Amino acid sequence: MARSIKKGPFVDAHLMKKVLSANSANDKKPIKTWSRRSTVLPEMIGITFNVHNGRNFVPVLITENHVGYKLGEFAPTRTFKGHKGSVQRKA
């Protein structure tokens, strides 16, 4: 079920504070965050976030296409090694 329109999008307060200060100072340094649940807002366009995926931080550059998604959607947490295929024997 989607979030109610009257509530608005969720962004952690500490993350929004860092975004606003980076915008006012024209700072291009990446913002390190563990907040995968925060929604990407138009104020975040052009900022690079280092999003934690459980092991390390994945750099994510926010563009217009990212608005409305969650930060965690751009930092995958699982690595897919592939299904076991059939072994080809030498003839």
From Swiss-Prot:
Keywords: Ribonucleoprotein, Ribosomal protein, RNA-binding, rRNA-binding
KW Ribosomal protein (keyword) present: yes
Pfam families: Ribosomal_S19 (PF00203)
SUPFAM superfamilies associated with the record: Ribosomal protein S19 (SSF54570)
GO cellular component terms, A-Z: cytoplasm; small ribosomal subunit
Keyword Hydrolase: no
Matching PROSITE patterns: RIBOSOMAL_S19
A molecular function GO annotation: rRNA binding
Database matches in NCBIfam families: rpsS_bact
Full protein name: Small ribosomal subunit protein uS19
Taxonomic source organism: Aliarcobacter butzleri (strain RM4018)
The gene coding this protein: rpsS
